[in-house]
Amino acid sequence: MMNVPIENGTFPHVIMGEFDANAGISQKKQPTKDPLLKGAAGHGCGHNLFGTASLGAAVAIKNLIASGKLKGTVKFYGTPAEEKFFGKLWMARAGLFDDLDACVDWHPAD
């Protein structure tokens, strides 16, 4: 998990950067859908987009805060195990969501 706060106000907002490392899928190590074995089970529902697009959004907000065009606090949380549903549970138990005003997460389509 990564917590990189950019502060210029109160009430933190978090952008979640989902990532997974699922074993046993038929997908070459690249950002586009390309199976190891044609027709084999794989996973390509946009997981290659989670981390990079979310980090890009956090950087854009950081730049607005730094320029004085926006007040607030933004944090970026690298979020593990989205596919298995327990990553956010670990984060909640660690108290990472306790002081937030809002938390943004999303899921692209395949």
Where does each model-flagged region fall?
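Acidic/His- and Gly-rich active-site-bordering loop/insert found
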Residues: M1-H43, N48, T52-G72
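Histidine/acidic-residue-rich, glycine-tolerant segments that coordinate divalent metal ions
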Residues: N22, D34-G42, N48, S67-D110
